[in-house]
Amino acid sequence: MAPDRLGPEGTARPNSSGISVIVVGLGIAGLTAAIECHRKGHSVIAFERMKDVEPFGEFGFESPYWLLRQPSKGDSIIIGSNGGRIFGKWGRGEVRNAMQAWRYTPTHADIYDTAGRFMAQSEIPKAADDMYFTLRGRLAKTFYEHAQSLGIDMRMGSKVTEFWEDSNRAGIVVEGERFEADCVICADGIHSKSRSLFTSLNAQPFRSGFSIFRGKADANAIIADPDAKWILDQTENTDQFKVFLGKEICVVIITCGLGRAVVCSAMHRDLNEAEQSWSTHANPDDLLDAIKDWPCRRQIEPIVRKISEDQFIDYPLLTVSPLDTWVSQHGRMILIGDAAHPFFPTSGQGGAQAMEDAAVLAICLELAGKGNIPLALHATEKIRKSRASVLQLNRTYSEGVQLAPALPKSKDSMSVPNVPVMDWIWHHCCQSYAYDEFDKVAEAIQSGSEYIPHNLPEDGT
């Protein structure tokens, strides 16, 4: 075991641990893994299928193939404080400072019926300084540029065709060239090519029966339109969060960056079961047609019209049942992020949980040392798997926005729960926990005894 501990804030000299790591996929999970492993002194080489990163791309999903893809299609992502405090340590606060303009500021969500009548207000607890509501592509771009500044070897346009391991090493094959390291971190998203190597269970993503229209509107165009600019009212002080509830569709319009961007989403029944792509380009008219009978359509339509067709998608909500293991047979490869536990984008925790995986893994590698790589990977799984699985199975967080079966006749009869912000989720510091618990976890693994995590809710659900 490593004798000295860097602690959550500590950074080692580059390549000082003697541990070599391959990262496959450069989404939120992969970028965080590359950066955190570098911080803890591990040697990192990362591979990404896409060829380049658009300099001002504003869009992407937690799948790496979309985070770094074409510019401008886009919407938002919430990073809870459990994730924000991880990148808050990077670059002496430089990454945190770069994201400060995108802090999460709404204090409540205003809920309306299909006629546009105000029904209720759902309180959003005051966000900590390390919670962010930002554009997905901007977050990925910021992480990528920080990784570049650290000199991390990131090879774009590299399609991995094979994974392999034995008791001593693990590696990949990229276009016929063989690479090896002490371990391979598989962060290749919900459509992971590596997942089938870890489990005999059916690990393919399946459709949930729901889908979401998603897109980013042009804020400058909205300002110029008298019928649309209502959404920017009061955004000089706080962002706006508007929800319009119908029986078969729920429309959400949110501003972020104090009105710098306006994003629109609409959860609806998934009627396109034959389509199996990650996302489907859609026309804003598809959304407007779904609310054609709503009296408040005239309020929503001017904003939706500001979303160009090439920035508008219909995103099927895919899921994967919790896996039986994240670690490969020889203990030299591990799944993290969406490859291990995909979340619905409505959960508000997909990105943060991926970051927790990456940060804990880097620490476990540090504490186990080069001679105990399988122990490090199994310890990461022990610390992270139960926590991620509880969140993955929790319907409040896995589905997020629920379609309303029927609205009450008046706002007085409507009971709307506040947004659930649970201390055990957002106030958790995964890095401190990993340092505190590693010895107990390692002992349990080596002795074959049970490890009971306490990074879960008290009732375990």
Swiss-Prot record:
Pathway: Secondary metabolite biosynthesis
Enzyme Commission identifier(s): 1.-.-.-
Cofactor requirement: FAD
Keyword Oxidoreductase among record annotations: yes
One of the record's GO molecular function terms: FAD binding
Residues of the active site: R214
Keywords: FAD, Flavoprotein, Monooxygenase, Oxidoreductase
Residue sites binding FAD per the record: E48, R136, D338, G351
Primary enzyme class: oxidoreductase
Pfam families: FAD_binding_2, FAD_binding_3
Superkingdom of this protein's organism: Eukaryota
Role this protein plays: FAD-dependent monooxygenase; part of the gene cluster that mediates the biosynthesis of the indole diterpenes nodulisporic acids (NA). Nodulisporic acid A (NAA) and its chemically modified derivatives are of particular significance because of their highly potent insecticidal activity against blood-feeding arthropods and lack of observable adverse effects on mammals, in particular the tremogenicity associated with the paspaline-derived IDTs is not observed.
Similarity-based family: Belongs to the paxM FAD-dependent monooxygenase family.
Protein name: FAD-dependent monooxygenase nodY2
Organism: Hypoxylon pulicicidum
Encoding gene per record: nodY2
